């Protein structure tokens, strides 16, 4: 486990929303309230977070892809950074409708982005002022909208979503396609439809950073375990090889 209860407390994971905004479906995960703010029961959060990271670790070990989604201001930078560290795709600016359900069209845009990036690398982009300006605007827009998924050649195997209420469209698309969702769920949202619920504060920058770091660590560990198994299997196969010399 790469996190502790103390870290969660320091990050404010246990602070929910004002009691008047609560979603009754989150009742099983609420400890109580203080100053009209719901307090999330971290004794429930810890095992659920462990279950979510175990799933992510196993999926990464099978070369699965987990798409990180966090477009809220306090989540953008850390989501992009931790997803990149784990070698996973991410959406940090805005979710484009149809990003999953209309992935065929998205793949066309990804192909165009790569072609334009190749032009920049080769120095063959338009040189005429007006055309150059249009080229720069288009590539900047594509990089902003889909830059985080430019290496995602197929639909992801799972979504990791910070703030399920803020990303309802992304979750709806995933559910429609049968893609599992790991989601941070605060007291003002519903955990229904989320395959791996992480009850916790989705507004605190420290809490968001903790979720993203722990998830990235789990993925990296899963990849490393998979690689070690391959190396050990190869070593075992070489040990079994016995050279037989020809009789004199």
Curated annotation (Swiss-Prot):
The keyword Cell membrane does not apply. One of its GO terms (cellular component) is cytosolic small ribosomal subunit. One of its GO terms (biological process) is translation. One of its GO terms (molecular function) is structural constituent of ribosome. Coiled coil: none annotated. The keyword Zinc does not apply. SUPFAM superfamilies: Ribosomal protein S2. CDD domains: RPS2. PROSITE patterns: RIBOSOMAL_S2_1 (PS00962). Keywords: Ribonucleoprotein, Ribosomal protein. Pfam families: Ribosomal_S2. Belongs to the universal ribosomal protein uS2 family. This is Small ribosomal subunit protein uS2.
């Amino acid at each position: 486990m790469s996190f502790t209860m103390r870290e969660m407390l320091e990050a404010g994971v246990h602070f929910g929303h004002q009691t008047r905004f609560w979603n009754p479906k989150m009742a099983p995960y609420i400890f109580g309230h203080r100053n009209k703010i719901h307090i999330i029961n971290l004794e429930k959060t810890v095992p659920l977070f462990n279950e979510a990271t175990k799933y992510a670790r196993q999926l990464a070990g099978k070369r699965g892809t987990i798409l990180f989604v966090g477009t809220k201001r306090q989540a953008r930078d850390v989501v992009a950074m931790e997803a990149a560290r784990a070698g996973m795709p991410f959406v940090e600016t805005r979710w484009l409708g149809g990003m999953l359900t209309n992935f065929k069209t998205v793949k066309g845009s990804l192909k165009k982005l790569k072609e334009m990036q190749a032009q920049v690398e080769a120095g063959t982009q338009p040189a005429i002022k007006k055309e150059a300006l249009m080229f720069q605007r288009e590539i900047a827009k594509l990089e902003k909208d889909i830059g985080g998924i430019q290496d995602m050649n197929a639909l992801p195997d799972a979504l990791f979503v910070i703030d399920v209420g803020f990303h309802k469209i992304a979750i709806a698309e995933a559910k429609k396609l049968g893609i599992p969702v790991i989601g941070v769920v605060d007291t003002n949202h519903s955990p229904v439809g989320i395959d791996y619920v992480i009850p916790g504060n989705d507004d605190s920058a420290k809490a968001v950073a903790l979720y993203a770091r722990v998830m990235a660590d789990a993925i990296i560990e899963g990849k490393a375990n998979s690689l070690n198994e391959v190396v050990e299997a190869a070593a075992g196969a070489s040990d079994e090889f016995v050279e037989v010399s020809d009789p004199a």
